[in-house]
Amino acid sequence: QWNKISRGLIQRVKALNLFIDDVYNKKKIFKDKVVPKDLIFNSPYYLKECDGISPKFKAWANISGVDLIRNINGEYLVLEDNLRVPSGVSYMLENRMVMRDVFPELFTRYKVASVHQYSNKLYQSMIECIPKKTDNPHMVVLTPGIYNSAYFEHSFLAEQMGIALVEGKDLFVENDYVYM
């Protein structure tokens, strides 16, 4: 069952990335009148500064949080897609570590999918998004701060990836370079 869900989620995220890419580039979805222009262009989440930009691998949403529910028939349905600032994975990772320590027999008895490589894969996907012409790149996790509801997530992932956790006030721009 999970293999089918996994394939569907991968397909869904690819479709969402292609949709976003079309909105900011070819705009075929508007020409074909699939989606009204005003619906997108009047959205507070539409960034006209992104028009004409084409991120590497057309990956507008490098991280996606898809909320699934199970209906009364036992079918899984997508409740919502979180593409802007998905959060929650750190709680799952932390929970899995605790569960493995407390109930190791469950992990040997059942085929529990491994999640221990998540932070490494996230780090690698971030590296792959760095433009090739960048000299001496540095990655950070940018957080609004300790009062943000996703702060645990930000600090956990920064620690797991071995990169700095910074707030906007920790950064400054000089001669078109960002410094910490």
Language model segments and positions:
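Domain-scale recognition of functional cores that engage charged ligands
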Residues: Q1-M180
